[in-house]
UniProtKB/Swiss-Prot annotation:
Gene3D superfamilies: Alanine racemase, Lyase, Ornithine Decarboxylase, Chain A, domain 1. Pathway: Amino-acid biosynthesis; D-alanine biosynthesis; D-alanine from L-alanine: step 1/1. GO terms for biological process: D-alanine biosynthetic process. Keywords: Isomerase, Pyridoxal phosphate. The active site is at K46, Y280. HAMAP family: Ala_racemase. Its EC number is 5.1.1.1. The gene is alr. Its cofactor is pyridoxal 5'-phosphate. It comes from Brucella canis (strain ATCC 23365 / NCTC 10854 / RM-666). Catalyzes the interconversion of L-alanine and D-alanine. May also act on other amino acids. SMART domains: Ala_racemase_C (SM01005). The modification N6-(pyridoxal phosphate)lysine is found at K46. InterPro entries: Ala_racemase, Ala_racemase/Decarboxylase_C, Ala_racemase_C, Ala_racemase_N, Ala_racemase_pyridoxalP-BS, PLP-binding_barrel. This is Alanine racemase.
Amino acid sequence: MSLPFSQDERDLAAGGILTIDLAALRHNYSAIATRIAPTRTAAVVKADAYGLGASRVAPAFYEAGCRDFFVAHLGEAVALKPFLKPDATLYVLNGLQPGTEAACAREGILPVLNSLEQVENWAALATRLGKKLPALLQFDTGMSRLGLSAKEFDRLLENVTLLSRIDIKFAISHLANGDEPGNAANARQLAKMTALLARLPKLPAALANSGGTFLGKTYYFDLARPGIALYGIDPERQHDFSDKVAHENKKPKHSILPVLTLSARVIQVRDVDKGATVGYGGTYVANGPMRIATIAVGYADGLFRSLSNKGAAFFGDTRLPIIGRVSMDSITLDVTSLPEGTLKLGSLVELIGPHQRLEDVARDCDTIPYEILTALGNRYARVYVYVNGGGTSTTA
């Protein structure tokens, strides 16, 4: 009889280790919640908490005082519900597909109603059940993505019976440029939101996303729903594509802590001669004798092909450039600068951490941190720790 594949063996077999600091997540939530109080602070945990594991991340936010959690799809909410206590409320940002209304009501999950059709479907269920059903109502104030249009809002206000069937908890909208403090579009959206709320007196409202929580009190309203800031990304830095030195020397304006580190295992170290080509297509040619190392992660693990001949890993303080094309399951590094024997089979190199933040990797990929974070995938060994808060680490 064969022995089961143990968790330790799974971790050792993985191509890399993704370490997630739950204490830093709690700190980031508390820092935002304290600063914008008495406005309530929700947590956006869609896409499996931005790829970090909603079943572990959401309870950490709950421990920090969060009671409002936003996901994108009803299935995400149903999956997360068992990991939260009964006084937590789950909201579905994309609203409901036809035929899912009864399941949503049965589970006690609140939909964000984004169109007149969704409002009508939710109200119809309320009529069948003989009771008002709670929901959030979203308005489009300038993003042209989700939410009732001005014409739909006019039609809704004319239908008193329809409105009477729904217990609207919040009127919400979403800022398209909240991470750009100087963008005039923010003020235009705020003005539209204020005008809409004037027609719905005393209704609580929510507008601010991560960036919006740094725009000033007029954007806070009654509930804010930060996302990326909770996961360690300063919303004002994420689009900084300046040179690396300037980027690293720019101190964050806000007390947001990084929440993850990512390391990868070495699977081979070898010496190559001048003229040797590296990787698919031979896009890198050795300009002299050099030592190279292959690590066991690739674009299937969120390290995009755009890092080819461009990005880097670190071993201690030593930068190890990526050479050749990034493959699906492997990346090759120039490790000539390290003494011979420093790296060997199983050694770990840093991909995201104190020497290279998530924003730096995103910049090298010509993308945003959201895309890297949500693409990291499930092939890493995941370790959840309480670094900033002390205590012991636990392995997922």
